[in-house]
């Protein structure tokens, strides 16, 4: 069952966008996952752990997530929440991760872990979710950002002498923008996100970044401020 699901993700992303499996940001430090203790008011002393991820997105990021979830078995209850901070990575990796998160019915929060236990008032500060990370964010059944976080998009890289606007590392890739944008529209529509996100993406050169305002994120149904989020969401058993 899992193999069929993973095969479906790979086929859905790679066949649809072809060369868009290329980078939107050259991976520097791979996305890493960890379980973080939580202490929310409505589950005092019995709160499930929360998954926190930071780094750049690999081409097969959904496989990394599933491997982490398997390793987490036996480590107590885990909430269906992913806190993410990422400058981007492989486009197809972000798309596949988004599909996987939706399949797992996980909520996604953009933010940076401070090293403390997560409570309703501490443990997270503002973070960044850019480029390919936005596809992962869109996959969340509920989507939030910590106040002050930055969420941004741009066109995929083309040509040879291009620096990613977030990582400032060189990228060498060629993308069929027309077919890629058509697939992105389908993806965001499936996830319940307004196509205004793709319009901003298509209009922003690869060496720049369009950062959404909080109002735009709400209007495009991309994410809401986490201050409006109820604590202690569903947990995985």
Task: Say what each PLM segment does.
Residues 10, 58-61, 213:
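A diffuse structural propensity rather than consistent per-protein peaks
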Residues 2-15:
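Bacterial N-terminal signal peptides that target proteins for export
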Residues 33-149, 153-155:
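Cleft-lining beta-strand/loop regions that shape enzyme active-site pockets
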Residues 25-27:
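N-terminal signal peptide c-region/cleavage motif recognized by signal peptidases
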Residues 1, 53, 172-176:
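A general boundary/transition motif marking the beginning of the first structured unit of a protein
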Residues 18-23:
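Hydrophobic core
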Residues 80, 155, 159-237:
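Charged, glycine-interspersed solvent-exposed loop segments at helix/strand-loop junctions
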């Amino acid at each position: 069952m899992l193999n069929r699901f993973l095969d479906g993700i790979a086929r859905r992303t790679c066949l649809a966008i072809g060369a868009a499996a290329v980078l939107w940001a050259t991976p520097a430090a791979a996305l890493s996952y960890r379980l973080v203790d939580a202490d929310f008011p409505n589950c005092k002393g019995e709160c499930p752990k929360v998954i926190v991820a930071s780094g750049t997105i690999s081409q097969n990021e959904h496989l990394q997530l599933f491997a982490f979830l398997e390793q987490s078995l036996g480590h107590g209850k885990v909430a269906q929440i992913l806190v993410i901070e990422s400058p981007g990575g492989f486009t197809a990796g972000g798309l596949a991760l988004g599909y996987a998160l939706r399949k797992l019915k996980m909520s996604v929060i953009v933010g940076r872990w401070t090293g403390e236990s997560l409570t309703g008032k501490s443990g997270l500060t503002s973070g960044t979710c850019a480029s390919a990370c936005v596809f992962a964010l869109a996959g969340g059944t509920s989507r939030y950002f910590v106040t002050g976080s930055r969420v941004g998009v741009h066109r995929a890289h083309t040509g040879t002498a291009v620096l990613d606007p977030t990582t400032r590392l060189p990228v060498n890739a060629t993308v069929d923008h027309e077919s890629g944008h058509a697939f992105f529209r389908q993806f965001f529509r499936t996830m319940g996100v307004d196509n205004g996100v793709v319009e901003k993406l298509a209009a922003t050169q690869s060496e720049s970044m369009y950062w959404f305002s909080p109002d735009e994120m709400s209007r495009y149904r991309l994410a809401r401020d986490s201050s409006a989020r109820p604590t202690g969401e569903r947990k995985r058993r």
